[in-house]
Amino acid sequence: MVYLYSVLCCLFLFPYLGWRAGQVLGPRLRRVFWGLLVLIFVLFSIALLIHRRFEADWMSAVMNGSVYIFFSTMYATAVVVGVNILRYIDARTLKLYTSARPAVKQGAKVVAFIAALAVFFTTMVIGHRNVRYPRVMYQKYTVKRLVPEGAQPEKRMRLVFFSDLHIGEAMTSDYIARAVKLIQDQQPDLILCGGDFIDHRAVYAYDPRVMASLRSLHAPLGVYYVLGNHEYRDDLEANIRWVSEVGGTLLRDSIAFPGDGPLTLIGRDDWVNGNRKPFEVIANEADPLRGPVVLMEHTPASIDSIGDSPVDLILCGHTHGGQIWPGQLMVWWRYGMVSGTRPVGEREVCISSGIGSAGATYRVGTRSEIRVYDLYW
């Protein structure tokens, strides 16, 4: 749907920008600018209609580019609107612009136009880099309930947690291969995927190049997945089957003991499944005396309802860190945190901003990441 929204919004944004640019540009440049806007809109409208018939790299680039232009156009429009708000305020207060000479007024319009163009291209570059160059966030967490008072931890386990890969038109096989290498470079004992490994269609995940990359994920204690809300959007059974075909283990309201070791891993189905098990039913199967208990759940909507259940570490994704500023404000309002870690009682909650992005490889105000957790007990 993000592609449809992009085209529809540009239908309203482009005329406004064309009108404002026409107040700055000469007749010839004005026609060129309008022609460029019309050409972009027509090409992306055609691409929207036919893109599902052409599952090719060039079509993915076209669709990805359309979303880039849409979001960067929004930021550029915000600059233009902001300038006009300042003019409105000035006209009713200081009247600096109103009383200025025509040459000064025209110069101010040119500066505003250049500023909007600068914001347009700058947000494109920033949006691209924030996805394409993920950061590695290292965390250390000691399970204090398993360490006698005054003693030092004796055991260590390294978990690598990633979420929101969103395999689709935007997340290319090349990027996925680099993401897999980044994960493997951390030398994990256990690899965990927190859902939304599919964006909107399973066909892209079944690309042989993508499957080859994901099959190369390996750790001594295994690779485990949970479902996110996007897996429910199209062909759930194909998405479930894909996990086993790339060598992963899917947890749906179930518990595993990776490598038959001390760690208890709880994998919860996503909240969009209204028939998922109550958490207390799943938690009854956990053995907190065995070792650390880790809960992996895609959406952090219900983490505050876990209560006194024996969970030491909660790993979630879903938020993308807001992905597009000021989306962070809505995420914070909904979940109480955007991304990162925070203590909740005797446990720690981690919300990852994710290693991919939805719709397009575009992030402003956040960055893609993987989380490396060194557990001590």
How should each PLM-predicted stretch be described?
Residues T142-W377:
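Soluble catalytic domains of enzymes that build or remodel membrane lipids, polysaccharides, and related
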Residues V119-L146, E169-D174:
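Hydrophobic alpha-helical transmembrane segments in integral membrane proteins
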Residues M1-R132:
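Non-catalytic terminal accessory segments
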Residues M1-S6, R129-Y141, Y204-V210:
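Short N-terminal secondary-structure initiator segments
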